Amino acid sequence: MGYLFQETLSSNPKTPIVVDDDNELGLMAVRLANAAAFPMVLKAALELGVFDTLYAAASRTDSFLSPYEIASKLPTTPRNPEAPVLLDRMLRLLASYSMVKCGKALSGKGERVYRAEPICRFFLKDNIQDIGSLASQVIVNFDSVFLNTWAQLKDVVLEGGDAFGRAHGGMKLFDYMGTDERFSKLFNQTGFTIAVVKKALEVYEGFKGVKVLVDVGGGVGNTLGVVTSKYPNIKGINFDLTCALAQAPSYPGVEHVAGDMFVDVPTGDAMILKRILHDWTDEDCVKILKNCWKSLPENGKVVVIELVTPDEAENGDINANIAFDMDMLMFTQCSGGKERSRAEFEALAAASGFTHCKFVCQAYHCWIIEFCK
């Protein structure tokens, strides 16, 4: 049904509020102390399909839905009669973070109603083939596998060692995934790869003239699927471990090849390393890059797609927030992985034998960087 609605307002707008620096700092401190609520509610909303449900209604005139309507349209119908009430409480929080818009129906009981905000499209499960989805990344980040690792952070700072290994019997992340099919499948669905690559291809022309393109550590092959759809003359080789390729669909012009990038890399006139280097130590990165160098012709290149950390931690800078969030994620989950600065990428290129390192363009949070032979 359609709703006439008004914007939600403070329940008691005439109540005096003390405004001073100390009060503002106190409010910020309270928000930080309770920061765990938002990501956990976001995760539950994604698992329930709340955003997909709201987004499906967004193109219609009756784009606002009541919690009762949302509950009735979820992929799994709740058995709990209190589900609409609980959803309303979750959605209020999400609205305060601008994930959804909250209004109040003017008819009937004046209940709250909700509509998807534009940011929701980045979290839709149905958008995976179009732009990718951050939904799985949220779910992975708050899976027990990662949460158990985060719990080791204090002890790693005090005593040293590896956070993931301490939590998971000495195994590293990629070894662990070989033992946990559920988590491996979830992990391989994560990320924002398709959106980043599509955005980059709007301006990046570095694949023109490439005949054979190797995606080193290419996972399920979706990056090459996007590139070869724009450049159908390219032969794509999606190179990764057997366990990763087991979940890879077929793409026109793309061959899946199993192997280990620490041993050798298939020959190609250009290569992609997409969000691979941040998983590894500098020493491991040099090993990977040297293997790429050996398999490239003269004037060949590696197209590195990575986040670049700013030199300073600026207050209120969203790029700095993302960079340092991801850096801590790499520190805890990837046994020596880290995000890197421009200078650190230049040092990796030089140590691996490449003549120069060129920062070409930025797409969302990632940079397209060329390591040229």
From Swiss-Prot:
Keywords for this protein: Methyltransferase, S-adenosyl-L-methionine, Transferase
Keyword Calcium on entry: no
InterPro entries in UniProt: COMT-like, O_MeTrfase_dom, Plant_O-MeTrfase_dimerisation, SAM-dependent_MTases_sf, WH-like_DNA-bd_sf, WH_DNA-bd_sf
Gene induction: By the green peach aphid Myzus persicae.
Chain coiled-coil ranges: none
GO biological process, one term: indole glucosinolate metabolic process
Annotated binding of S-adenosyl-L-homocysteine, by residue: 217, 240, 260-261, 274
Catalytic residues identified in the record: 278
Pathway stated in the Swiss-Prot or TrEMBL entry: Secondary metabolite biosynthesis
Gene Ontology molecular function, alphabetical: methyltransferase activity; O-methyltransferase activity; protein dimerization activity
The EC number(s) this enzyme carries: 2.1.1.-
Superkingdom field: Eukaryota
Pfam families: Dimerisation, Methyltransf_2
Top EC group: transferase
Similarity comment: family membership: Belongs to the class I-like SAM-binding methyltransferase superfamily. Cation-independent O-methyltransferase family.
Functional description taken from the UniProt entry: Involved in indole glucosinolate biosynthesis. Catalyzes methoxylation reactions of the glucosinolate indole ring. Converts the hydroxy intermediates 4-hydroxy-indol-3-yl-methylglucosinolate (4OH-I3M) and 1-hydroxy-indol-3-yl-methylglucosinolate (1OH-I3M) to 4-methoxy-indol-3-yl-methylglucosinolate (4MO-I3M) and 1-methoxy-indol-3-yl-methylglucosinolate (1MO-I3M), respectively.
The protein's assembly and partners: Interacts with B'GAMMA.
PANTHER family: O-METHYLTRANSFERASE
Protein name as annotated: Indole glucosinolate O-methyltransferase 1
Species of provenance: Arabidopsis thaliana
Biological classification of the source: Eukaryota, Viridiplantae, Streptophyta, Embryophyta, Tracheophyta
